[in-house]
Regions:
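Phosphate/NTP-binding elements of NTP-utilizing enzymes
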Residues: 2-367
């Protein structure tokens, strides 16, 4: 991105418009400073957490000096990557530090940087003031801002991690990282070694889980295991969403197959405390009043871990009906069922504990 002297002067003039106040939160700054366009989202405009309020607390971990490790074990369509992008943008603008974004492969890292990360910066005036005058200092993999640096690396190229002291590490989709070999050390281990030069370092781990022994599930277990609780619109008690509480009407077409249209229309959530019927609109409203609650009192101080299934997503592909149909289609095969459990429920796969025989009107699945 080439900036003329006039553009640079105008950006300097606007600096105070985006300068954070001491009491400004990460979320406040992001919502005032970042813009998403059609290149990143189907809902372009100013960055906002209003539809996905569960992203707010994890975002504040970027500023919280008592937190040094954050794990997001989240399902699909939950905005975990956008949440990380907003937090990293805040860091670059407000606490300039060397940072590393580690992804499964270098080609994926390059594509992500080019198609999602850099467009967000270029569309946000507050971030343009962090750009250097020399355009060649910002590439897809190496980005030297005016006061900070960011490097994108693939886990399949661990040699690129050598001699890179960083204060902040983002390890994205860690369960898809390349395994260590006799010739190459584990990329995640190497990346974490790079944090030792900074006493205020932070590490953010994200992924949908795969198996119990996988990286993200083990990281979640060692943290304080936070889960998002919502108020039931009927009894007002706080509950965490569980797949077994999703139900639908038994509906078959003339050929004996599932009538997916009727199933999608009838699916709803049943409160596990009062048995009240919770609709999709109820869920969206309840999200605004949700609370993250830690469930592991034995976690080390400063080690946060958040679990969030796609049940919480307000996305149209995560309605009760859409997920019910996805489940019925997926359970026809073990591979499909594992994909549903990992991707939508954000739970690890344990084949020996899976019960494939279920009633046709229940979402019961034991993992």
């Amino acid at each position: 991105l080439n900036l003329t002297d006039l553009q640079r002067s105008l950006l300097d003039y606007r600096r105070n418009l985006y300068r954070p106040t001491p009491m400004q939160t990460v979320v406040d700054w992001a919502e005032a400073s970042l813009r998403l366009t059609q290149r990143q989202t189907e809902h372009p405009g100013p960055f906002s957490t209003s539809v996905r309020p569960y992203t707010r607390e994890p975002m504040e971990c970027w500023k919280d000096p008592t937190v040094y490790e954050v794990t997001l074990c989240w399902g699909s369509q939950t905005s975990k990557t956008t949440t990380l992008m907003a937090g990293l943008a805040w860091l670059i603008a407000n606490e300039p530090s060397p940072a590393l974004w580690l992804m499964p492969t270098e080609s994926l890292a390059r594509s992500f940087s080019k198609s999602r990360w850099l467009p967000m910066l270029e569309d946000s005036p507050a971030m343009l003031e962090c750009y250097p005058a020399e355009a060649d200092k910002i590439t897809n993999l190496e980005q030297n801002f005016t006061r900070s640096t960011l490097t994108f690396v693939g886990s399949n190229s661990p040699a690129n991690l050598a001699s890179r002291p960083v204060r902040v590490l983002i390890a994205d989709e860690v369960d898809k990282f390349a395994e260590a070999t006799a010739r190459e050390a584990d990329a995640l281990d190497l990346a974490e070694q790079r944090l030792k030069s900074f006493s205020s370092s932070k590490a953010f781990m994200t992924s949908t889980p795969t198996v119990v022994e996988g990286r993200i599930w083990q990281r979640f277990l060692r943290g304080d295991q936070r889960r998002y609780y919502l108020p039931c619109p009927h009894c007002r008690e706080y509950i965490k969403l569980e797949w077994r509480q999703v139900t639908w009407d038994d509906a078959k077409a003339e050929d004996g197959k599932h009538d997916l249209g009727k199933i999608r229309a009838s699916a709803h959530y049943v409160c596990q405390l009062c048995q009240g019927k919770i609709t999709d609109s109820h869920k969206v409203a309840a999200l605004r009043h949700g609370q993250w609650r830690p469930e592991n009192p034995n976690a080390m101080p400063g080690v946060r871990s958040y679990h969030l299934s796609s049940l919480y997503s307000p996305d149209r592909k995560c309605t009760w009906g859409y997920l019910a149909v996805s489940f019925l289609e997926a359970k026809a095969s073990m591979a499909g069922l594992q994909g549903f459990i990992n991707g939508n429920l954000a739970e690890p796969w344990e084949q020996q504990d899976v019960q494939q025989e279920r009633t046709e009107t229940s979402a019961t699945v034991t993992v």
